[in-house]
């Protein structure tokens, strides 16, 4: 088969206990906490399973150490919980819905992410201040998600599924793979 060749990249860094980039770990924690909130069903009850996140960190130019979270992007699938009608146009309903999601991400999700990191004794919690830029569903309403929203196995999200923008990537996607074929090889530098 086609599993006899490929370019694989991998690296470790000392930004986190997991030896992965802080941006990636923070994105993962955001998505894990978002899933917990959705499963609890107490707040943000409009949440649906499809979501993605990106975190940008400002680094010290001399030491290359993380200074602070600069930007957080959260795109999350949701119900249409505010509908047009009763004097609301479709545009007004969508704007109110997006404003409510944005407010909930800022006041519910991000504080819970920070608390989760603090409980774990993770130094990444200290990077999340109050001065970050927040983008929530920046492309607008996100009602259709999952396979219906991203049809086809075209290798979407290969960078976000690995190291983010911090490392090289061989180009292979994780979707649509024969599970017997190699996806990741780890080798020590020569």
Label every model-predicted segment.
Residues 176-183:
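Active-site pocket-shaping loop/turn-to-helix segments
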Residues 12-16, 147-149, 158, 179:
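Short capping/connector residues at structural and topological boundaries
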Residues 184-190:
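Residue-level detector of conserved catalytic or cofactor/ligand-binding positions
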Residues 1-144:
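Glycine-rich, mobile lid/loop segments that gate access to catalytic sites or pores
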Residues 149-175:
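A glycine-rich, aromatic-flanked flexible loop/lid motif
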Residues 113, 164-167, 187:
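Alpha-helix capping/termination and helix-coil
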């Amino acid at each position: 088969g086609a599993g006899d060749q490929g370019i694989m990249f991998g690296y470790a860094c000392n930004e986190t206990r997991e030896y992965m980039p802080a941006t990636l770990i923070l994105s993962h924690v955001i998505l894990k906490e978002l899933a917990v909130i959705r499963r609890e069903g107490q707040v943000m009850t409009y949440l649906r399973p499809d979501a993605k996140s990106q975190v940008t960190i400002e680094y010290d130019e001399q030491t290359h150490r993380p200074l602070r979270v600069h930007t957080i992007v959260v795109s999350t699938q949701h119900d249409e919980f505010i509908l047009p009608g009763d004097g609301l146009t479709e545009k007004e309903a969508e704007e109110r819905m997006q404003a409510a999601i944005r407010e909930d991400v800022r006041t519910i999700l991000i504080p819970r992410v920070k608390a989760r990191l603090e409980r774990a004794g993770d130094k990444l919690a200290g990077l999340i201040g109050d001065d970050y830029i927040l983008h929530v569903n920046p492309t607008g309403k996100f009602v259709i998600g999952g396979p219906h929203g991203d049809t086809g196995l075209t290798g979407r999200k290969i960078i976000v599924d690995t190291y983010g923008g911090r490392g090289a990537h061989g180009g292979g996607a994780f979707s649509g793979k024969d599970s017997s074929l190699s996806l990741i090889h780890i080798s020590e530098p020569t």
